[in-house]
Amino acid sequence: MNKFRMLPPLLGLAFLLAGCGDSRPAETVRLVTYNAGTFNKYIADDYPLVAEMMREVGADAVCLNELDSCTTRTGGVFQLERIARAMGGWDYRFGRAMPYRGGSYGVGVMTRERILDHFTVALPRGEGAEPRVLTVVELARYVIATTHLDHTSAAAQRDQVAVINRVMRERYAEASKPVFLGGDLNALPDS
């Protein structure tokens, strides 16, 4: 778990620094994680607003959490597809955590680059908690994974992180490109 101790502050810092202009070297990748809260939670039709925020920070890829896919709650909208369209037709992959109201609920990744491969892994579930997943996409220059860890149990979080570490080591320990993890880790500074 020590590997993940600094992840939330570093992701926050990366997001803050993202607004410091776009004079970055060509090999730089700007990653953003965003808990969408099924969009429309606070503002009706906030897809254009979120897309504009992502453009302003110069995102190359975005990890999204709390997404509905074709549920009755959100009028049958495939939210990841809709926000990817709002970004100008970005590529995307959805990771289904559970069936929900006629559709699915889960996490996703969208990117301006073409996705070459992807997979989703179910994570251990805390007692009485929602199902959780890890969704991984591979691009030509890097690999990015997203998850939404349990918020009800530190033990469940540890079990979920253990699976994430195992899966990522098995698949990418010898990778010649960088591997990133983003998402809602539900972590506090002292966790």
Label every model-predicted segment.
Residues 63-68:
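A short beta-strand-loop structural module common to alpha/beta enzyme folds
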